[in-house]
């Protein structure tokens, strides 16, 4: 069944409507669809509020602006999808992008390297998004970037060898995730003196990272059983029963870098 764009990001519908649209194309994964629908709704609601605020500022004189309360700025947020290979993470993101009619760029984190080395640098992902938006900067700035295999960006254990595809890539990625202006080539995948450059602001781009995080279940089991007591009077109840932050605690052990854990 071909996915037709039926949702408008300029008047983003309620999360239950987004989820209902996903139900027409994606079978199962109920929890993932619900969480993603809420996250997308919150993201584009913030984007539209930000655009409205900028438009009001352009139509406001300096004197009026000084007397106007700007309100609270809503910080940018991104998404992390955890699931085994073949569970439908990429398909879910593709379907969502088509329903919203926004450009989508998909990349594999294992192909990313530090700028200047063989491979794609992190800024090339923004170039792909611009190309998907037919070089329309404004449309690209409202798009989605999906970075798969994010768990493969863990820092290499060999400290004597330069890490060009691990922590160095993470540092460059953090700038984009937090929101920054990036210069990218127009109509090309790499920077070239003969290719015109343009600036893309990543503040309103939705970044979705996906990964299998192998070994995470073992870390959770180890954490649960570490302080387990033995004997006839042992307390058999898990210490972390009902701990909503358990997954986040365990991700600390598999997260690529300390700053990415946020």
Q: Language-model segments: which ranges?
A:
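Conserved alpha-helical scaffold flanking the Walker A/P-loop in AAA+ ATPase domains
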Residues: 124-142
């Amino acid at each position: 069944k071909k996915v037709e764009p039926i949702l408008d990001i300029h008047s983003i519908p309620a999360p239950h409507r987004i989820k209902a649209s996903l139900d027409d194309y994606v079978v199962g994964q109920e929890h993932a669809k619900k969480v993603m629908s809420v996250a997308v709704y919150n993201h584009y609601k913030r984007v539209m509020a930000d655009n409205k605020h900028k438009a009001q500022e352009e139509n406001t004189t300096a004197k009026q602006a000084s007397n106007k309360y700007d309100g609270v700025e809503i910080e940018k947020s991104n998404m992390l999808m955890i699931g085994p290979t073949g569970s439908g993470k990429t398909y879910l993101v593709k379907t969502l992008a088509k329903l919203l009619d926004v450009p989508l760029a998909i990349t594999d984190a294992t192909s990313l390297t530090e700028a200047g080395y063989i491979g794609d640098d992190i800024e090339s992902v923004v170039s792909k998004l611009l190309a998907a938006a037919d070089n329309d900067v404004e449309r690209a700035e409202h798009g989605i970037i999906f970075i798969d295999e994010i768990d493969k960006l863990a820092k290499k254990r060999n400290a004597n060898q330069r890490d060009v595809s691990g922590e160095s890539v993470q540092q460059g990625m953090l700038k984009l995730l937090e929101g920054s202006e990036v210069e990218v080539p127009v109509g090309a995948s790499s920077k070239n003196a003969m290719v015109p450059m343009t600036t893309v602001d990543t503040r309103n781009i939705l970044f979705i990272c996906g990964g299998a995080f192998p070994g995470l279940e073992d870390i959770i089991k180890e954490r649960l059983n570490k302080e387990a007591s033995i004997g006839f009077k042992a307390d058999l109840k898990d210490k972390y029963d009902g701990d909503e932050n358990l997954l986040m605690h365990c991700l600390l052990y598999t997260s690529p870098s300390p700053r990415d854990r946020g």
